[in-house]
Amino acid sequence: ILSKVGEEVTIKKITGNAETKKFLNSLGFIIGEGITIVSDLGGNLIVNIKGARIALDKSMASRILV
């Protein structure tokens, strides 16, 4: 995810193996869904998706392309 804090972006693609994609889908990260970056601390993110705040480490966040 490359965007600024407070900016709403749309998920274009999710990369990784099937297990990673399934995990992210279960959290609500689906292609076409809008997300907002709430906080970025050294690449570790807190994002708002569907009204929920989710923490992602740098490696997991890198799998979500916007």
Put a short name on every predicted segment.
Residues 1-66:
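Compact, glycine-rich, soluble single-domain proteins
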